[in-house]
Amino acid sequence: RTAPVVYFSHITGIYDEYLGKQAAREGIDISPDTLWQAGIIVAKKAYHLTKRACPAVGFIGGGARGLQHFTEMVGANACITINWQGTADKLLETNPPVVDRFHAPVDEAVLDELLTKMPDFRRGYMLNGITPPEYEGFGPVELFRDSFTSAWENARKLAKERRAKQ
């Protein structure tokens, strides 16, 4: 089997983080358990659509914010990026059973609630929910970009301070 030469990443945890903030900001009454599943539901759809259309493209699950962003991906032919502190260390500590959760069907009631109550879930989940020109301004993408930019600027600042001490 040849490894993929092209990969794409779904920012599962950042997507959940954004939706949680959107629900709080807009006063959306939605179950925390439903929100907990949102990013994984989108990841499953993106994964399956891509595997059907372009089976050689690899999948990376990124932006993990909780253990579920790793454990719910078990069974997928995917690479998952996680932090050591708060994720990898907790997985080692809890040693949960290894169960293929990725191929479990999505609960239709959960999907319906997300599609009905969360506009940016619907936009990210539905085919053609956002257009290419809208992508850059899509809330979860902005959150990812802004988080990355902030962390990069902090790294540059730290490097500059350390060089100044030499």
Residue ranges of predicted features:
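C-terminal extensions of enzymes
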Residues: 99-166
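Catalytic alpha/beta core domains of metabolic enzymes, predominantly
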Residues: 1-101
